[in-house]
UniProtKB/Swiss-Prot annotation:
It comes from the Archaea. The keyword Methyltransferase does not apply. It comes from Methanocaldococcus jannaschii (strain ATCC 43067 / DSM 2661 / JAL-1 / JCM 10045 / NBRC 100440) (Methanococcus jannaschii). The gene is cas8a2. Transmembrane segments: none annotated. This is CRISPR-associated protein Cas8a2/Csa4. CRISPR (clustered regularly interspaced short palindromic repeat) is an adaptive immune system that provides protection against mobile genetic elements (viruses, transposable elements and conjugative plasmids). CRISPR clusters contain spacers, sequences complementary to antecedent mobile elements, and target invading nucleic acids. CRISPR clusters are transcribed and processed into CRISPR RNA (crRNA).
Amino acid sequence: MIIKGLRVEKEKLQSLQKFWRLRVMLFETPGYNEILDLYIAYGVVECLVREGVENLRFFPIGNKYCIVVEEPTNVNIKNRIEKGMLNALEDMLSLHKAIGKYISTKEDIKIISDVDFSAGANINNVYWDGIPKTLEKIKENIKKGKLSTKSKNTVPLTLMPAAGKYMPKIYGVKGGNPIKIDDSNYALAWIGFHYYAPYINISDNRATYIHIYAIKPLEELGLIEILALKDLKKKINNYQLGKYKFFVNKKLALLYHLTHTESISALEIVTKKNFSVVSYTLENVDNNQAIRSFGEYDLSKLMDFLWYLKATDFYNTIQFVDNILRGDLEVSLTFIDGILYDDLDAVYSAIRKLKSVRISPLIIQSILEWFGNFY
């Protein structure tokens, strides 16, 4: 089967009695690593959705993730996943080829683009052409019905930051040697990352920083919540470091991203559920690569804050956040930490330091009302 550990357990099915007229399938991720498993799970969901599956639920269980699918008994779920995988890979690789730069070498022609599975979200330039070629081979093997079950594909830091010697111990995550996984899980992980994992690539002449945000559900999600998460992901997120220094900080970069990409309707849907975000930054300075930051914080709170303000005054919310971010870095950090840790005094202090900036009274009122919900 596509995912190791596929099983239907009697005790779990008992809680799904009302669906017994349907075929109930429980998919469990392999258990490689919390982040890698999350991307694999999102990949499974994307493949199923592309094949018209609507009755599915997605939830965490320990460091793994489960997808429950309820479909008529005559539906072959395995075939649907493979067809969805083929469809997703075709779309991803078509985008890569359409916007990519073609480079002739002695061996062949390399294609490098700003999509996430090429140069967009990979710090190591070996992967810029290598990953797309691997996904191309997997796509052709799906067509032939010859998916390899051998664990031969190296997982890059982008998909699993703990799988590499560049993970410092100070972040509380033990680094290790890169692991290898089979074709199906490799493709599923990249599909999940491509459609559900926001990232921001910032660079200048000597440095590149790639902030990656793995969105973790802390409770069960239905199809509507899952699809709303896709609004978080823009396909290309590249910025010049020289213009916006705040992008170096992963929390401030996320605040900017959410402010400028997330719709009010999607924010409203997502804030009804509990999520956390595991953020990590891949850094390349003067050809030295490393993971410089790794952390987890409450995404739901940040999104709820933005939804509350945007619902009141959409335009001025964007202007207000931009003014905060483009000011003093210490002020910006004080502001976002005040939101994440329910500290109204910190937010007020940051706002007071915005000298010569006119702030809409509606924004101030909305901030006070939002904090009032916690007291």
